[in-house]
Amino acid sequence: MSKTFLRPKVSSTKVTDWVDPSFDDFLECRDVSTITATSLGVNNSSHRRKNGPSTLESSRFPARKRGNLSSLEQIYGLENSKEYLSENEPWVDKYKPETQHELAVHKKKIEEVETWLKAQVLERQPKQGGSILLITGPPGCGKTTTIKILSKEHGIQVQEWINPVLPDFQKDDFKGMFNTESSFHMFPYQSQIAVFKEFLLRATKYNKLQMLGDDLRTDKKIILVEDLPNQFYRDSHTLHEVLRKYVRIGRCPLIFIISDSLSGDNNQRLLFPKEIQEECSISNISFNPVAPTIMMKFLNRIVTIEANKNGGKITVPDKTSLELLCQGCSGDIRSAINSLQFSSSKGENNLWPRKKGMSLKSDAVLSKSKQRKKPDRVFENQEVQAIGGKDVSLFLFRALGKILYCKRASLTELDSPRLPSHLSEYERDTLLVEPEEVVEMSHMPGDLFNLYLHQNYIDFFMEIDDIVRASEFLSFADILSGDWNTRSLLREYSTSIATRGVMHSNKARGYAHCQGGGSSFRPLHKPQWFLINKKYRENYLAAKALFPDFCLPALCLQTQLLPYLALLTIPMRNQAQISFIQDIGRLPLKRHFGRLKMEALTDREHGMIDPDSGDEAQLNGGHSAEESLGEPTQATALETWSLPLSQNSASELPASQPQPFSAQGDMEENIIIEDYESDGT
C-alpha cells in the first residue's frame, strides 16, 4: 500500500479525541473524556482550510505550532478571505440598490408607494386601525427592494415575516419522546399558522429589537409579509379571518407582496379575492416588468465597473449580447444580473450567441424594412435560451390581443408567391405570430382559450360575412372537441382551427397596410358561458327535484313539458313548482332583451375555470365526459340543492297564490308521509 493511503489510518487515533459522540448522553457512556471541537478552534476559515495543512496532517504536529500564528499571517489570511468573498459574491447582492435613484422601477410606482407609506405610517392617526397594502407584480421587478429603500429613507422600521423551519431535535427532546418508563409521548410541534398569528400580535404590539448597527430612534414601523405559510394556500379562509381581525386590532400597516405566476396558479385571486379587498379596504399596487431600456442601463453600469476592476478575469459582452439578455429575461432584473455574471465568467465565452446567416428564402419573401426585424426577432427567441433567459410567457389579455388584432408583415409585389385568380379572396399577408405558440405561452387549455376567443371576436370584425365565416370555424373547432373519446387527441387541432380561422376570416385585417376595425383599444371580457352553464345546472337539479314523477331527461323536461305546464290552468298544490314553472316557462314581456352584464378582463388575469365543475372537469368547455353527452352529472347531491334566488322569491307569484317555500322542506315532508304509510300497511 502507498503512504498516502496509510496516512489517515495513522492519525485516526488523534482525531477520535476531537469528536464528541452524538449519543454519548443517551447511551450513558461517560467513561471517555471528550473535548468540544469549538472550544479549541477546529472550525477554521475557508482560507485556512484551503491553503493550510489538512486536519489529518496538522494533527501530527504539536498543538503549540497549530495554535500560535504570527500577526502577519493572521492579517494576510483576513485580507485574502475578504478578497475571496468579494470576488465570489453574487452581483445581485453586490450591486443592490441603496437609494431611490438606483431603483429599476418607474418613478410613478415609487411615488405611489411613497404616498401610501406617508399617509398610513407618517401621518397615521393614534386610534386608526390596521391598514393593509397588497403589492403584486412579476418576479424581479423590485417590489421588496422598493419597500425597504423607501422605509429606510423615511426612518421606518421593517419587521419581515420569514417562514420558520422545524427546530432540530435535541438530546433531551429525543429522550422525552422515547422514554420507556412513561406511557405518554409528546411530540413538540406548532403549526405555521399559529406562529404567524403570534408574530402579527407581537409585531404590532412591541417594537423591533435593536441589533448591532440598527438605528431605532423612531417608533414608526411596518410589517412585511412576502412568504406566506403554505397552509393558507390550502385554506384561504383562515387568512381572511386573520386579515379581518388585524384590521380591527392592528397598530401598524401590514404589507403583502405576491409575485404574479404565469403557470395558471393565481395566488392573488385565491388569497385576496375582491370581496376581502373591499371588506378590509386593502390597497392594491401593481408593478410592471422592468423595461428593457432601464435594465440595459443597469447592466452596462455593472459591466463597466467589473471590467475596470477585474479586466482580465471576466469576459466583457458587447451591446448586442446585452440586448438579447435584456429581452430574454422578461423584465426580471434579478435573473438578468445572475445570467450576466454566469455568462461573463472566464471560460464561458461560448455562452454568448453569435448570429448566423439568414436563409435566402426569408430574404426573398420579406421586404427590406421587415427583413431586418422579423428574422432578428425569430433568431432572438432562439438565442436568448442559450444565455439562460426565462421562458417567455403571456398573460391571457395579451394572448387574446395577438390573435384578435392579428398583425401581419407586408410582402413584396414581385418576389412573393401569389394564389391563382379563382382563390384570390383567400390571399393574406404573412402573420407576425404563430397562433399555436401564443396559446402555448398563455398556459391555458385550448378549449378554455376558445371560450374567451368566442366571447370577444365579434367586436374586431366589420363585415357580417366575415363574422359568419369565423363562427363556422369556431363551430367546427367545437365539434372536434365535443366527443370525449377523441377530445384528448383533437384538442390541439381544435385550438389551431379556432385561432387561425378567426384570424383568416377577418378580411379587414388581412393585410399589413389595412387598419380594419380601427387601431383603437377595445376592452376584452370574460365568457358568459360560465354563468349560463351554472344557471342550466341549477335549473336541471330543480326540475329533477320538483317533478320526479315524469321520469324525463333534463332536455325534454325543460323544453317540452315545463313550457306547456306554464300555459295550462291546472292547479298545483306545490308552491315551489308554481314559482319554478313561471320562471322557466314564461318569457318576460320586454320588446328589447338586454345583454347579460359582462365582466371585463384585466391585463394580468388568468383564465377562469368554473369552480362548480370540479377539478376533473375538462372544457368542452368545462364539463366532464358525461356532461358533454347532453346532461349534467349527478355529482351534486339533491340533498344539498336549493332553489336559485330568482326562483325562491315571492315577487313573481300572483297575489292569490300562496308564497313559495323551500323545495327541500317539501321533499322531507313527502318522505315522512311515505314512511308513515308504509308502517301502517
Curated annotation (Swiss-Prot):
Any one GO molecular-function label of the UniProt entry: chromatin-protein adaptor activity
Biased composition (Polar residues): 631-662
Modification Phosphoserine occurs at: S71, S86, S359, S646, S656
Residues that coordinate or bind ATP: G137, P138, P139, G140, C141, G142, K143, T144
A GO cellular component annotation in the UniProt record: Rad17 RFC-like complex
InterPro entries (UniProt xref): Checkpoint_prot_Rad17_Rad24, P-loop_NTPase, Rad17/Rad24_fun/met
Keyword flag Membrane: no
UniProtKB keywords: ATP-binding, Cell cycle, Chromosome, DNA damage, Nucleotide-binding, Nucleus, Phosphoprotein
Compositionally biased spans, kind Acidic residues: 666-681
Subunit structure: Part of a DNA-binding complex containing RFC2, RFC3, RFC4 and RFC5. Interacts with RAD1 and RAD9 within the 9-1-1 (RAD1-RAD9-HUS1) complex. Interacts with RAD9B, POLE, SNU13 and MCM7. DNA damage promotes interaction with ATR or ATM and disrupts interaction with the 9-1-1 (RAD1-RAD9-HUS1) complex. Interacts (when phosphorylated) with NBN; promoting recruitment of the MRN complex to DNA damage sites.
Function: Essential for sustained cell growth, maintenance of chromosomal stability, and ATR-dependent checkpoint activation upon DNA damage. Has a weak ATPase activity required for binding to chromatin. Participates in the recruitment of the 9-1-1 (RAD1-RAD9-HUS1) complex and RHNO1 onto chromatin, and in CHEK1 activation. Involved in homologous recombination by mediating recruitment of the MRN complex to DNA damage sites. May also serve as a sensor of DNA replication progression.
Record protein name field: Cell cycle checkpoint protein RAD17
Organism: Pongo abelii (Sumatran orangutan)
